[in-house]
Amino acid sequence: MSNLKKPLDWIISKGLIDYQEALKRMESRVEDIIADKKNEAIWLLEHPDIYTAGTSANFRDLKDPKRFPVITTNRGGQFTYHGPGQRIVYVMIKLGRFDYDIRKYVYFLEDLVIKTLKDFDITSHRWDKAIGVWTYKISRSKSSDHLDQYKIASIGVRVRRKIAFHGLAINIAPNIQNFEGIIPCGIKNAKVTSVFDQGVEISMADFDKSLKSNFNKLLKTYSP
């Protein structure tokens, strides 16, 4: 069986998984994939409250460093928040499935979130100013109503020896106020939303089921 035709392992962790412990487990899995000892994997989990700084992070974007623990990590991107109610999706996958094109892979991740949210009647989109998935909300004022961009999912990726890892953070029902301690994505006045904040109540299990279905369908269209 071709290395790109092997099945991917789906792992779902219950409870809150410590961020640094998750990094160790992910790094170990990546090394096993490189050595062809284990299959590629998609790991679904949640973290305790934490701020993480990617390789492009500017610490001036950390507005409240005492609010939660702050960890510098090796994923791409800038500052983000992780916490309960947010679905973390760590994708450990061979970049050869995407013609070794990191932009194509990121496009796949964005497409995955957009199609999964659509299953729950949430319309979302890419934004040319920042990687991730965004949606609109109506902002009301005395003079007029207008649509504003709100981020609903973040993407941060790293590649080691042609294996991509880290992945996605999708806001299902986190405490949105916890994002106030940072400038998400380094974009001043960036606004954040969630599935719940969009008026949709779903369980993690329902989201995971839809995500897996869309992942398997999309992978067939993206893989060479």
Roles of regions detected by a PLM:
Residues 1-149, 201-205:
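N-terminal lobe of the biotin/lipoate ligase/transferase fold
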Residues 152-155:
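Histidine/acidic-rich helix-loop-helix segments that form or flank divalent-metal centers
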Residues 174-224:
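C-terminal accessory segment of soluble enzyme catalytic cores
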